[in-house]
């Protein structure tokens, strides 16, 4: 039978080992590195039309779609990325070409595009956004508004290389 010896020398040695392990990060819980990539949302690609034109505004405007685009892992802002936006609005249904447009992110990875007021379809006022330029994996989003009276909606992308 083995007997454990817990004298002062053994306790100090064990305490020292624990302190070294803790300082080196060996006792920290596992964590995700940085920013996890955005997954496509169900219904995000509904009525998608490849190649919507880059524009300053869709239709007569009055509603703002905005957000950011970052790199998975380190969260660095991604400038010059094309984001396509479409929705069911007061000026047209989401499958109609005039309801689609695209914009580019600025140097901070931010985008903003004015469009007509989004109105409910199938009970939920929502927008559609897509990153589909090829350098990173394609992502489709379908954010839902809390109320049809809101005049803006945000969506954020974290992209991973294709």
PLM features: what roles do these ranges have?
Residues 15-18, 22-28, 131, 139:
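Domain-scale detector for complete catalytic domains at protein termini or as standalone homologs
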Residues 30-162:
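Beta-strand-dominated extracellular/periplasmic modules and repeats
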């Amino acid at each position: 039978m083995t007997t454990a010896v817990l004298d002062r020398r053994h306790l100090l040695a064990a305490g020292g080992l624990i302190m070294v392990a803790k300082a080196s990060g060996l006792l920290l819980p596992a964590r995700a590195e940085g920013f996890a990539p955005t997954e496509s949302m169900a219904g995000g690609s509904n009525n998608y039309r490849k190649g919507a034109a880059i524009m300053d505004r869709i239709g007569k405007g009055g509603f703002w779609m905005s957000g950011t685009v970052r790199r998975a892992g380190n969260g660095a802002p991604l400038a010059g990325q094309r984001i396509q936006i479409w929705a069911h609005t007061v000026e047209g249904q989401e499958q109609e070409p005039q309801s689609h447009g695209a914009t580019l992110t600025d140097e901070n990875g931010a985008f903003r595009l004015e469009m007509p007021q989004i109105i409910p379809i199938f009970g939920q006022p929502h927008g559609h956004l897509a990153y589909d330029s090829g350098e990173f994996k394609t992502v489709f989003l379908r954010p839902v508004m809390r109320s049809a009276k809101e005049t803006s909606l945000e969506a954020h992308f974290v992209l991973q290389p294709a």
